[in-house]
Amino acid sequence: MLKPRAAEGAAVALLRLLLLLLLLPPELRDRGLGVAGAAGAGLPESVIWAVNAGGEAHVDVHGIHFRKDPLEGRVGRASDYGMKLPILRSTPEDQILYQTERYNEETFGYEVPVKEEGDYVLVLKFAEVYFAQSQQKVFDVRLNGHVVVKDLDIFDRVGHSTAHDEIIPMSIRKGKLSVQGEVSTFTGKLYIEFVKGYYDNPKVCALYIMAGTVDDVPKLQPHPGLEKKEEEEEEEEYDEGSNLKRQTNKNRVQSGPRTPNPYASDNSSLMFPILVAFGVFIPTLFCLCRL
């Protein structure tokens, strides 16, 4: 049994250690406690299928391994016309994912086997590297017969030689595929189709499917021009009769999830050391009282 002074010294030392732990920056505290902190951790393992359309195999900055296009020599045509251009919104290391593409004069697509049920996200990567105005290339994207992207005009969305991601969440449960409010029978495979429209040919630069939600998907770098356009669309208007404010909301597919609130994670990480402090301090105090 510890002597009173020794027990008191041990308790003081423990409290100092816990106080120091509370004062550490969140990233260091989480690392020391073994708490998963970095966003995107485990992302490569959650990706079940990824293809660099029209290009060679590539591992991106997040560790996702994009395989060489399996449609090479079978369907459509590969193009590396975009290799002449820098791609905005993309990191230099991953511009290759937007500089090559596969297109076809008719509807074409990819077939992806999915063995397990759960929540998934389809991420489609595009960049317009040829046309310099809108209404030149417009097409739809279908997933197992569901139109998940309607009238996609890449130039109209983000401009020329600029990366654009379409992010489509879905769930597979009890033999059913649920996507964008629609449900269909699922037979073990996802069919991703790029549908020929009235304006030029459908295409895709890269694509992948991952287990998870849209919050798990890495987002592209900010696009100042696009942000300004969205702000203008959301400006407040006034009704002439009542002067009531209303907000105009365009039903647009965003090119990535919202930035997570950093303070939300900070609060959760603070709770762990506080609980540890109480859990250790109370038994120590009890031992001191018995002395």
Curated annotation (Swiss-Prot):
Entry GO MF terms: carbohydrate binding; enzyme binding
Ranges per topology, Lumenal: 31-268
Acidic residues: bias regions: 230-240
Gene designation per UniProt: Mlec
Protein name in the entry: Malectin
Highest classification ranks of the organism: Eukaryota, Metazoa, Chordata, Craniata, Vertebrata
Binding sites annotated in the UniProt record for a carbohydrate: Y81, Y103, Y130, F131, D200
Disulphide-bridged cysteine pairs: none
Ranges of biased composition (kind: Polar residues): 244-264
Function: Carbohydrate-binding protein with a strong ligand preference for Glc2-N-glycan. May play a role in the early steps of protein N-glycosylation.
Topology in the lipid bilayer: Single-pass type I membrane protein
Subunit structure: Interacts with the oligosaccharyltransferase (OST) complex.
UniProtKB keywords: Carbohydrate metabolism, Endoplasmic reticulum, Glycoprotein, Membrane, Signal, Transmembrane, Transmembrane helix
Family named by the database record: Belongs to the malectin family.
Stretches for region Disordered: 220-264
